[in-house]
Each structure stands twice: as structure tokens, then as C-alpha cells.
Regions:
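An amphipathic, aromatic/His-enriched active-site/gating alpha helix that lines ligand/cofactor pockets
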Residues: 33-44, 65-112, 123-139
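N-terminal low-complexity, charged segments
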Residues: 21-56
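Short, well-ordered beta-strand segments in beta-rich or mixed alpha/beta enzyme
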Residues: 6-11, 20, 46-78
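Long, hydrophobic N-terminal alpha-helical segment
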Residues: 1-34
Length: 139
């Protein structure tokens, strides 16, 4: 199983602090459904950090993800659709993103083995059924 471990920085558009507050509250207030979307993306860990640096606001995404999950843009989940709306309103596209380079990735063997088992289960249920959309959208 191939894992991607990322830490990426994005700049928030000027004047969007209150909207970012709303965005983070939305994700926290809908955590059960938010976690379901992560399963479909094979996203095992996702954490959002926030920082003010030299008077500018930034959001950082830390993630641990296996290959082969659905892309957020392909999701039918209301969580993902709303997340994309907030993203487009709040994230400054002129800044791009800054990916920090991992130097050491430390995942204890029992945790890695659990992720491998989840990866196998995902492939057996989602991929082998020939689904092209998130299972959440099929219910």
C-alpha cells in the first residue's frame, strides 16, 4: 500500500476570516458525515491548522492518504460540496499552495497494518462492485 503524507499551506483571502470560522464550525458540527467522506477518499488522517503569519492568515492541511480513493470533486456528499464552496470563497488562488517536504514519516506497525486492512476492505467493497461514485451517494 502506498501512502501519501502531506502538509500543505494555503493563504486565506483578505477579509475572509469570519467565513473561515464558519467553514471550520461547519466541519466540526457535521463531523460524523465529514468522517464518512474521508473513508471514501482513503484519507486516514486529515487535520486542518490555522495560522496568522506576518499579518496574513493561512490554513494548513496535514493528511495521510492511500492511493485509489475518490477525488473530492467526484463526491456527491453534501459535506464535500459545501467544503468546495468554502474553499473557493476563502482560499487565495494567486498564492497557490506550499507543500512542506516530509523528512521522516513515523507510523507504528499496528497503525500501518490497520490502514492496510482498511485499504483492502475498501478495494473489496467499493472498487470490485464497479462503483464509480461514492457509496454515500448510492443510498
Amino acid at each position: 500500500m502506498q501512502l501519501t503524507v502531506e502538509l500543505s499551506r494555503f493563504r486565506v483571502k483578505e477579509g475572509k476570516t469570519a467565513k473561515v470560522d464558519e467553514w471550520m464550525a461547519f466541519l466540526n458540527n457535521h463531523m460524523k458525515d465529514t468522517l464518512l467522506t474521508l473513508e471514501n477518499e482513503k484519507m486516514y488522517v486529515e487535520t486542518i491548522f490555522r495560522e496568522i503569519l506576518d499579518g496574513r492568515e493561512y490554513l494548513y492541511w496535514y493528511s495521510v492518504q492511500a492511493e485509489g480513493g475518490i477525488e473530492i470533486e467526484d463526491s456527491e456528499s453534501y459535506i464535500d460540496k459545501k467544503h468546495i464552496e468554502y474553499w473557493e470563497e476563502c482560499i487565495d488562488p494567486s498564492y497557490g499552495m506550499v507543500d512542506l517536504t516530509p523528512q521522516v514519516v513515523m507510523i507504528p506497525k499496528p497503525v500501518y497494518e490497520t490502514m492496510e486492512e482498511l485499504d483492502k476492505q475498501y478495494d473489496e467493497t467499493f472498487k470490485k462492485r464497479g462503483w464509480t461514485k461514492s457509496p454515500m451517494s448510492l443510498s
